[in-house]
């Protein structure tokens, strides 16, 4: 898969943009209908939880240690470290992106709080 690192880095960055995180319409363009997230808070989120009354916080984020594993021609795993500069919290992140109808959608995401700099 050509340019996989750049493609999925950009998709993760879009997912983290405040204008996307605060728009149910924009989130619906990224999240798969069967999306599931195990949040860093320990809460489980599903796509149906994101509606006009619930959007994500518009925090300032920085991605590092970004890695892509191509699982198949239509499925990719991304892993990275995320620094939330607003909340001053570090997390380890993993996402599974699936390609459906020629569009990549976020199917699964997990955040795990860490104090480790590795």
Q: Which ranges hold each PLM region?
A:
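A beta-strand edge to alpha-helix "cap/lid" segment located at domain peripheries
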Residues: 2-21, 25-118
């Amino acid at each position: 898969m050509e340019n996989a690192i750049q493609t999925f880095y950009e998709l993760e960055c879009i997912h983290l943009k405040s204008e996307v995180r605060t728009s149910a319409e924009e989130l619906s363009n990224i999240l798969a209908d069967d999306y599931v997230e195990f949040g860093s808070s320990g809460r489980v989120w599903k796509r149906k939880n994101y509606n006009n009354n619930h959007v994500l916080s518009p925090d300032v984020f920085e991605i590092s240690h970004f890695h892509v594993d191509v699982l198949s021609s239509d499925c990719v795993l991304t892993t990275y470290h995320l620094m939330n500069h607003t909340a001053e919290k570090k997390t380890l992140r993993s996402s599974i992106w699936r390609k459906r109808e020629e569009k990549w959608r976020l199917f699964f995401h997990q955040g795990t709080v860490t104090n480790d700099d590795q």
